[in-house]
């Protein structure tokens, strides 16, 4: 059974910024925040609070001998500077703490490895403090067990989304789209994205000629009668196509390179991140494919080869060389908005053809 882990957001900014951010956090599936419950006011929310307050759901005790409020989870916050601090955490945790909040200012990995190893066998949860999405990723992967929760100091919803990909809880709305046009368009430059991860059947990248209409392009884990499986690769599409990044912004496929991070999704929309090991741009015969989902129409230009596959609503794969008008494939689509350097601009008018 997989370990339950939480991304706990510690929002920064004014009350007005907070009022805007909290509903967004709920929409993204965040369940816990590190915040004084007083700042929630009388607003109804499902968000649970962690804070040095008896009104919080998870009460951070400020003194070791403080009275424990009934019916609440209780913990302590610790700053770790040496192994002595780690031993102190273990001693106090054994006295009945439900959780510990750990802040390590330098050499984060080794101290947290030691804390996880020592607290792993007791029922005290470990919440670690992070300041960047990259720190969130490291803390969730330490010793392959990771901490139970990461308190992430941010007021950026894009950073929250990026961190959720590292947690493995980010998801995208996927829907079936009907193929309405297929046409050979001659040669063009296409991009093969070789990741540093093994990709599973059903997984791929979101690719499209429009940022609001992206096709799920499957990886090459299946192979063909002429090629061996390459389960790390996605033959993504033409250089102009968009793909989504973990932070929610878009990149052109021509911008993807060694060290870039890309989103890997399955047909249900569950996302994880992968690091790019290599990006290959080569000239190949290309196909233009258009599809319609609801009132939106989008397209993609992909290589004309049997190893490029889309995913059907039933999970089956279909090669672009066998694709027909009327077939349905999985896409991520939404109403069109403008983009400025990859960032969504919600009020800008845009028409793409």
UniProtKB/Swiss-Prot annotation:
Keywords, in A-Z order: Amino-acid biosynthesis, Aromatic amino acid biosynthesis, NAD, Oxidoreductase
A single Gene Ontology MF term assigned here is: NAD binding
This enzyme catalyses: 2-amino-2,3,7-trideoxy-D-lyxo-hept-6-ulosonate + NAD(+) + H2O = 3-dehydroquinate + NH4(+) + NADH + H(+)
Would you say which domain of life the source belongs to?
Archaea
EC number of this enzyme: 1.4.1.24
Which Gene Ontology BP annotations are present? amino acid biosynthetic process; aromatic amino acid family biosynthetic process
Family in the record: Belongs to the archaeal-type DHQ synthase family.
Protein purpose: Catalyzes the oxidative deamination and cyclization of 2-amino-3,7-dideoxy-D-threo-hept-6-ulosonic acid (ADH) to yield 3-dehydroquinate (DHQ), which is fed into the canonical shikimic pathway of aromatic amino acid biosynthesis.
- Name this polypeptide is given: 3-dehydroquinate synthase
Organism whose genome encodes this protein = Nitrosopumilus maritimus (strain SCM1)
Organism placement in taxonomy: Archaea, Nitrososphaerota, Nitrososphaeria, Nitrosopumilales, Nitrosopumilaceae
| Gene name tied to this protein | aroB'
């Amino acid at each position: 059974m997989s370990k339950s882990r939480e991304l706990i957001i510690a929002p920064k900014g004014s009350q007005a910024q907070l009022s805007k951010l909290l509903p967004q956090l709920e929409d993204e599936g965040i369940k816990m925040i590190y915040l004084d419950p007083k700042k929630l006011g009388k607003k109804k929310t499902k968000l649970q609070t962690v804070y040095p307050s008896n009104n919080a759901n998870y009460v951070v005790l400020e003194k070791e001998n403080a009275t424990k409020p009934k019916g609440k989870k209780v913990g302590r916050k610790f700053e770790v500077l040496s192994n002595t601090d780690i031993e102190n955490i273990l001693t106090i945790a054994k006295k009945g703490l439900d959780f510990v909040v750990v802040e390590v200012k330098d050499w984060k990995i080794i101290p947290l490895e030691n804390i996880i190893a020592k607290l792993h066998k007791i029922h005290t949860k470990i919440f670690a403090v992070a300041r960047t999405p990259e720190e969130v990723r490291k803390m969730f992967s330490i010793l392959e067990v990771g901490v139970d929760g990461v308190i992430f100091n941010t007021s950026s919803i894009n950073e929250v989304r990026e961190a959720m990909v590292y947690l493995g809880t980010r998801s995208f709305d996927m829907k079936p789209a009907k193929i309405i046009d297929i046409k050979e368009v001659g040669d063009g430059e296409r991009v093969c994205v070789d990741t540093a991860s093994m990709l599973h059947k059903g997984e791929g990248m979101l690719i499209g000629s429009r940022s609001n209409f992206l096709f799920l392009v499957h990886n090459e884990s299946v192979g063909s009668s002429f090629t061996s499986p390459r389960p790390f690769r996605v033959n993504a599409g033409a250089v102009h196509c968009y793909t989504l990044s973990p932070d929610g912004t878009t990149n052109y496929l021509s911008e993807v390179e060694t060290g870039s991070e890309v989103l890997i999704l399955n047909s249900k929309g569950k996302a994880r991140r992968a690091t790019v090991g290599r990006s290959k741009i080569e000239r190949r015969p290309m196909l233009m494919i258009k599809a319609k989902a609801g009132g939106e129409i989008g397209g993609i230009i992909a290589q004309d080869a049997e190893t490029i596959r889309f995913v059907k609503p039933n999970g089956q794969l279909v090669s672009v060389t066998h694709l027909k008008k009327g077939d349905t494939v999985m896409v991520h689509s939404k109403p069109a908005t403008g983009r400025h350097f990859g960032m969504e601009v919600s009020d800008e008018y845009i028409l793409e053809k």
